[in-house]
Amino acid sequence: MPARRATAITLWPCDAQARPLAAAPPTPWTRYLAWADGQVVGGGGFTGPPRQGRVEIGYFTLPGQQRQGHGRRTASALLALAWAADASLTVIAHTRHAPRQGRHNTDAAASAHILLSLGFGPPRPARASRVGPVWRWALPPTRPDRQPQAPTINR
């Protein structure tokens, strides 16, 4: 079955349990549900406010919504939010190392593909986290004319 083309992503601020917030927070450094075609397709957000000129993003796509461009659009929307708040930020992300036993970690590969397509890289090994060894990806600030368009935020 061919992958469907993703439509525009709308971000909806939410709390840690994915409950939509009644009002948008005063800063963008929060979590979001990603909506497309009238349904939740995934989500993402920031691990906290910027520190030392860097901010970290994380994102995901729900099963059944993968391979439709939602992950890339969500990550791109997070970049736009970060740079709209502070155009000098370097944005970082982490992905898992793929296992060496020949079994491919498809989530890590998909995420690496998204990050590469957005200009991140090259990845560097980072300290092991609670999920095991990870790669650290970085994207320095880009020229304003090359920054992604700001997403729609449901308020």
Regions found by a protein language model. Give the residues of each.
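Amphipathic alpha-helical recognition patches that constitute DNA-binding helices
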Residues: E56, R73, A110
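Conserved acetyl-CoA pyrophosphate-binding loop and the N-cap/start of the following alpha-helix
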Residues: Q65, G69-L78
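GNAT-family acyltransferases
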Residues: M1-E56, F60-G64, L81, A85-L89, ...
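Glycine-rich, flexible loop segments associated with nucleotide phosphate handling
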Residues: N105-S111
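Conserved active-site tyrosine of GNAT-family acetyltransferases
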Residues: L115
